[in-house]
Amino acid sequence: MPETADQNARAPLAGSADPARTPTSPAPHSPGAAPMREMKADLVVIGAGSAGLSAAAGAAQFGLSVVLYEKGEMGGDCLNTGCVPSKALLSAAKAAAQIREAGKFGIETTPPRVDWEKVKLHVRTAIATIAPVDSQERFEGLGCTVIREHAKFAAPDTIISPSTRVKARRIVIATGSRAFIPPIEGLAKIPYLTNETLFDLPDFPEHLVILGGGPIGMEMAQAFVRLGAKITVIEMDKALGRSDRAHAEIAIETLRAEGVTILEGYKATKVEQEGQTIRIHTEPKDGAAWIVEGSHLLVAVGRQTVFDGMDLEKGDVDHDRKGILVGDTLRSRSNRRVWALGDAAGREQFTHIAGWHASVFARRAFFKQRTTADSLPVPAVTYTSPEIAQLGLTEAEARKQHGDDITTPSFRFEESDRAIAEADTEGEVKLIVRKGKLLGASIIGKDAGDLIQLVSVAMSNGLGVKELTNFISPYPTRAEGVKRAANAHYADVVFGKSAKRLVGLLQRIP
């Protein structure tokens, strides 16, 4: 079936709800007030982020009664403190960078002046523009009962909040994640930043030190250096360690060229503050210790799931530090009424994965299909300039599994007419192929996150590298690079000695 639940959270507003099946949201419960309201629902969803909203919207539009709990902001981390504000900030930073680089096109400019308050206004405007799609009013219009309270288990089939007790046929836990704070000496004593506080900084940071060289850390490093801050990134291992290594190095060198200091193989051991200066002590894997001083510290070393005060044990819901214990069906192994979606499932922590999980839930719970969370390859994008897009196995992972029985046909954007015209030729398309089967792809360059979708469609539908050669790509586009990388896989066959002999023989035919 189509991916209905994944789309519903951002679908146009549906018709009015059926009053016969839609309970009303109760008033908050307090001592001396009316007794706690008792309700029954086909589905209780805890968490109004991407996964929870998609699951709730889909179920409501299928005609089921839905209670949606959210104690914080509707839209969750992605809308309010994650994907949307970070990409809005990156867009502002990109505009500043383009002004500085306009000279290569023969356009003379003056250095851009950054107004931090107006940059933050741009970020807030992006959030506010999208917010109605995720709003309480919209979901009440779809037929959901939205309760803005903390929810917890009272029994395996019962969820309670200060005002309401709901007995549910099915329960979805979609509570997301928050920044992981490492146990570094002195860290708790200083006003460090996370993604939840970064975008509301009252003053622009003079020197932002970032703990963590993953996608979030590197994206914010580039954003703030382009806006005029001094940046130091401290990474215990390799920056962008989950990306194709060669592509990661291209991005790392680009950031260094823009002025970002990146310390790889350095572990932060102690943090202290003296006046307005934050001091981070580090220990390297090799070499001398380094003390980094800055005005602000951003912690971006990873994420941890959020189950605070949910009384999961009362719901017979087993979990570990990564998330609810589920299989590839996303159903709790200990309580069959419960499903975990998005970050709560302890798998890849992407908004698009959360939406996919909601689709898997809808297909399995409502239509009894056999779709699993692992049935499609997962694309991942780091939104630096150049972007890095990854799908399936990296080259290193493929060689570890299959040895030399793989090929890596590629196409460099320095050969792309569109990239040349745009004076932006950094990067390449690399396919990972084994016996004609696509095992993965990595793309680095402008719009890599859009280009990877061609390969994602192919891999998701069982198509091989051959099918990526068999379509007409408009000229001039960067997307041609995917087709030309696929063509490169067959270069020796098409233009080799055997082909030449065959063509020679065929030319003898009148």
Give, region by region, the residue ranges found by the protein language model:
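Flexible, glycine-rich terminal cap/loop adjacent to redox cofactors
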Residues: 46-72, 77, 84, 88-95, ...
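FAD-site-proximal beta/loop scaffold in flavoenzymes
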Residues: 188-204, 291-367, 454, 469
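Short hydrophobic core segments
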Residues: 44-46, 151, 166-176, 211, ...
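Glycine-rich flavin
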Residues: 2-7, 12-41, 57-64, 69-204, ...
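A structured beta-alpha segment of the ubiquitous adenosine-cofactor-binding alpha/beta core
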Residues: 162-164, 268, 281-291, 303
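Glycine-rich dinucleotide-binding loop and its adjacent helix/turn
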Residues: 83, 175-234, 258-261, 313-334
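Conserved phosphate-binding and hydrolysis motifs of nucleotide-dependent enzymes
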Residues: 47-52, 176, 212-217, 302, ...
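Beta1/beta-strand and adjacent pyrophosphate-binding region of the FAD-binding site
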Residues: 37-51, 204-211
